[in-house]
Amino acid sequence: MPTIQSIKTHDFRRKLMDGAGSDAVHTDPSYGYGVTLLKADNGLEGTGIAYTLGAGTNLICEAIRILGESLEGREIEELMADFGAVQRSLAEHPGLRWLGPHKGVTHLALASITNACFDLWAKSREVPIWKLLLNLSPEELTRLIDFSYLEEVLTISEANELLHSYQATRSEREEVLKTGYPGYDTSVGWFQYSDEKICNNARAAVDAGFTAMKLKVGAKDHKHDVRRSLMVREAVGDDVRIMLDANQAWPLPQAIDACLALKDMNPFWIEEPTQPDDVSAHQKLAEVIAPVPVAVGEAVSNRVLWKNFLQAGAVGIVQADCTRLAGISEWLAVVILARKYPVRLVPHVGDMGQIHQHLVLFSHI
């Protein structure tokens, strides 16, 4: 079995042009990765990523170098046999923990390292990641997860029982391997796009077969958002799902006013309406705008915060992201939490590497 011989990092950035990627808060983004490269003694290389908007990617790479040192010389099967314990030891690094804990630069570095471990493991077994995960027993899956700080709501035995309960009907869901799963076009309505460009993009998305799309909102004057959302609704008709994404732009009073005004266009969800750590604000907003669900996740950094959101009924769409959480391992913990409560899971795709194509297949089946 392959043994990790070296750990390298790469600071990858790509500038976006002409308003692409813009939202109400992030006005001039690049797309970037803090990349982990795990080179094995048999020539295989595991690649992991954590997503950024460019600036600061070098900080993640430096944290990867420090956290990754302990993985050199580890055999991949032995490493992954109890990866939950491995991840906890990395997250509790006595020097770097103070910079988090479980959030920020060090947590993004852990995401990149974890994703590289899973990639190397899948390559060593000669299967894609979705197949790797589906081939594991519930007990093997739960050994990949650090359950610390979740014990009062989700024990390992409860997680195993929940996973076993889905196996009886698994064959009914495997049809998705033939048909594929539905997606939505997130590039239709970037915040800095003109009205004309948004309408043209929306119609083109429908012509391409999309039945759902996203529009960026979050203007200081919500009349601007209402006008644009109704414009898109008119362009694509009532049968197309339109999701609205404010990217954390509003304080709670403004979020309530804006979301109530936007309800008339029948959004499929309203995403990141306010500060991403503010569970009580999301709880209040979810009550006020029901039955329209509140979607959060791309900036929810760890399983404990997800526990709080789910306990409070503050989220209607779980958009867990394995490049924001501590990689696939912590993402699995959030998936099981979401299944327990239960709340609908729509993984966030904060990556150009498309890890989530694998994770969506796994979570659906």
Across the structure, where does each feature detected by a protein language model lie?
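Short glycine/serine/threonine/alanine-rich loop segments
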Residues: 73, 127, 292, 343, ...
